[in-house]
Each structure stands twice: as C-alpha cells, then as structure tokens.
Amino acid sequence: MSCVAELVFFSGTMDCGKSTLALQMDHNHGARGRVGLIFTKMDRAGTNVLSSRLGLSTGALEVGDDLDFWDAIVGRATAGTRIDYLICDEAQFYTSDQVEQLARIVDEMDVDVFAFGITADFRTELFPGSKRLIELADRVQVLQVEALCWCGRRATTNARVMDGVMVVEGEQVVVGDTQPGTTGLVEYEVLCRRHYMRRMTSHAAKAAALSPEVLPFDLDVCPLPPLPITQAD
C-alpha cells in the first residue's frame, strides 16, 4: 500500500461491479486496521445505504448537493475521529465542487479517497462528477469485469429505456429500475456502441426477431454468404 494518499476513480458501465468493489475495498482496508467512512448518493436500494447487485450492502452517509466534504471531514478530525480513507460510491452524481473538496482532503489531510462511478450518462455525455474526477484523479481505473450487451459484445454505454424504447432526451439524472422488461418504468440497459447507435435494446431485438418483415439476425454479425461466380460460356 502506498505511503502517499491518492484520489483514485474506479469507473465503468452499469453491471461491472463498482459497488461490489467498493464494499470489498472497505472490508480489505478495515481488516488491516484502517478506519474509513462510506459515502453514496441515490443508491437504488434507498438512502444511507451502499448496495451491490449481488445482494451485499452496508450503511453509508448520504451525499446531498449541499454537503461540503472538506468541512465534514475536518470537523470529524477536529473532534478526534480517525479517518484513513473515504469510499465514495455513485460519484458520478457528485458536484464538481465536491470532487475538488475530495482532492483537497487527499492533498492536505493525507486521506485516501476511492471514488466509484459511471463515466457517461444515457446520452454518452460525461457526468459532471465523473468529468472532474477524470481531470483531478491520481489514477483512473476502468474496471476489468466486462458488462455485456444483449448481443454478447462488451457493453460500453448505458441506455435509458421506457417501455422497451430507448430514449436519448430528458433529465440527466433519473433513478430507475435496472432489470430490462419492467414496463411503465424508466429502466437502464447496457449496450455495445453498435447497438446503442442503432437504438437496438434487448426488447427491440426480440421484437425484430419475431417480426416476419425483417431478417431475424444482424447482417453485420451473420453476413450472408457471397453469391457464386459463374463463368461465361
């Protein structure tokens, strides 16, 4: 473990294990006698909780837009609370000012900050928090657990889906269900770039496969065999 505190941003799409890694890192550091605080914002399981899709969860401090990380951590340290590291989940939702406060905590208080978040929104535009983390972090680590598109390719984008139809307009932050097929709700689905650009969700792919008016496969994935060349007499 480095003797110099770092600001590290662990990034990836949905389903790549960010929150699971956050929980594991807290466990590992705690097992070595280090003391930390866990922060999160708008976790799908509710407020004041950090949860993963594997069913693991733990209590956390909820981050509001008005939270000043610097004041909060300095206040605890002044009161005698030992703090060696911070776990900051759903960091894409933090404000740019809050990310700058986290960087200051690393530099001036020698406290490690491990931030976890999605890089880009459903429009493939950077979240403000993620953008500032990329700009300021000592290290940016793309998680190696690959989320998969419905076609089996590596997923690189987060699509917003309403009633099976992918949308590319609307508020940047809308918390929704993450299990495809929940009608009447906003949901999210990870897609490869090709199917994001085509707006081809798993729901749309199934509909296309059942339609007699379209070929039931992707010609780019399963190209038709070339026509035989006939010799002139």
Identify the meaning behind each predicted range.
Residues 145-181:
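Short recognition patches in nucleic-acid-associated and regulatory proteins
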Residues 7-9, 35-37, 84-87, 112-114:
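Residue-level preference for the first positions of well-ordered beta-strands
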Residues 2-77, 121-132, 145, 173-178, ...:
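Conserved P-loop
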Residues 106-129:
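Sensor-1/coupling segment of RecA-like P-loop NTPase cores
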Residues 137:
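Short basic (Lys/Arg) and small-residue
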Residues 28, 104-105:
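Alpha-helical scaffold elements within enzyme catalytic domains, especially in hydrolases
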Residues 89-91, 117:
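Walker B catalytic acidic pair
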Residues 91-102, 122-127:
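Conserved ATPase-coupling elements of RecA-like P-loop NTPase cores
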